[in-house]
Structures are given as structure tokens and as C-alpha cells.
Amino acid sequence: MAGKLDRLQRSLGHRFDNPALLEQALTHRSFGQPNNERLEFLGDSILNCVVAIALFERFASLREGEMSRLRASLVCQDGLHRVALELDLGEYLRLGEGEMKSGGFRRPSILADALEAVFAATFLDQGFAAAKAVIDRLYDPMIAAIDPGVAAKDPKTALQELLQGRKLPLPTYVMAKVHGEAHAQEFEVVCEVNALNLRTTGRGTNRRAAEQQAAELALAQLRKP
């Protein structure tokens, strides 16, 4: 395990003073205790903060809502999964036998959670500056590729214009589910781009918010290199 972790640490650009933190970050709950669930919680907050700083410093012309949408697209499961794949993070995960047999090392949710846990482990190992350096290193290519003109548009508008530019039919939005009590409902909407066989699911406290998230996820798929 130590040799494999050396490779991962080189990819992260961070050498752990306490390698046990990194091992815990890579340990799924199916493997046993201690696992990475608590680290994932902390890493999510650290990632949101670092990405917010990066967007604030790089895009002085963007408004709060525009930066919030961009941050959401970068720190969502899809964004985390992309970074985790670049790190070959699945190769380093410690999973229970059943989870390993079912392909858990490829599952986007497990990879995304583990990456957030790695960010937390870096923070606990050497502080916020170290965690920020790792996140900046991994996320800079995606942030550098952002077009501020496109970012200023809401996701549904941006997706519509992108498809029109490619001479493709417009997307459709289908209400899939409504969860919760009347005073605290969560809406689930599916965005379908049938010409590309693309389906994404967004969630929000109202239908419009769910549609916007679904469109944002579709955009992220279409903008992949």
C-alpha cells in the first residue's frame, strides 16, 4: 500500500506527514473502521471554500449568482468524479469484498466521496494552505477552461444556445419526482437531449432550480474534453 500511496501523493503534489490520514480517506465504510465518512463531510466544506476563492479571484466580472452556479458545477459529483478519474483514485481505495466485487472502485459516488475525504486529510495533515494547494492544482485546468461569457448565462440558456450552435434539437425537461412534505419539498427533474442520448437529473427546492441544475450537469457532460 505504501508504494501505491507514494504515487498518489506525487499526483496530489502533497507528501503526508501522517500517511494514516490518507489511508483513512481512502477507506470506504464497507471495509471497516476508521472510514472516510467524517472526512468526506469536512472535505466538502474545504472544497467549496477553495473553489469559491479561485472563482472570486479569477473572474472579477461575475456576479454572486453566476459564481454560485459555476461553483456548484465544479464541486458536484460529476466534477469530483472527473478529477478522481484523472488521479486513478479507484486504484487506491480500500473497499469491502462485496463492494469490490460489485465494482465500487468505479462508482462515481464512491470516488467523489473519497476525493473529498482526501482534501480533508490534507487539511488535517498540514493545514488549510496545504489543502488549498492540492485543490488548486487539481481544479485549475477546469477553472482555466471556463468562458466567462458563457458562465454569465443561466444553465438552461447556455445549454439551449450550445445545442442550437450544433444544429441539434432543444432539450426537454421532465418532472421525475417530488419528495418531502409540502413545506419542504425537493423536486427532481430530468433533462433529456435525445439527439445525443444524454440524460441528467437535477434537484432543487422548486422546479426551476431543479431544471437549472439538470441543465448545468448536461453542460458539464457536453463540455468534457
Curated annotation (Swiss-Prot):
RNase III domain: which residues? 5-127
According to its UniProt entry, the protein's GO biological process terms are:
mRNA processing; regulation of gene expression; rRNA processing; tRNA processing
Q: Which InterPro entries match?
A: dsRBD_dom, RNase_III, RNase_III_dom, RNase_III_sf
User: Where would you say this protein principally sits, based on its record?
Assistant: cytoplasm
State the source organism's domain of life: Bacteria
EC number(s) given by UniProt: 3.1.26.3
Enzyme category, top tier: hydrolase
**Reactions it catalyzes:** Endonucleolytic cleavage to 5'-phosphomonoester
Give the residues the record marks as binding Mg(2+). Answer: 40, 113, 116
Q: Which residues form the DRBM domain?
A: 154-224
The cellular location(s) given in this protein's UniProt record come to: Cytoplasm
Annotated catalytic residues: 44, 116
Cellular component GO terms held in the UniProt record: cytoplasm
List, separated by semicolons, the cofactors it needs. Answer: Mg(2+)
For this UniProt entry, the molecular function terms from Gene Ontology, in alphabetical order, are: double-stranded RNA binding; metal ion binding; ribonuclease III activity; rRNA binding
Name the protein family: Belongs to the ribonuclease III family.
Role noted for this protein:
Digests double-stranded RNA. Involved in the processing of primary rRNA transcript to yield the immediate precursors to the large and small rRNAs (23S and 16S). Processes some mRNAs, and tRNAs when they are encoded in the rRNA operon. Processes pre-crRNA and tracrRNA of type II CRISPR loci if present in the organism.
Official protein name in the record: Ribonuclease 3
Gene name of the encoded protein = rnc
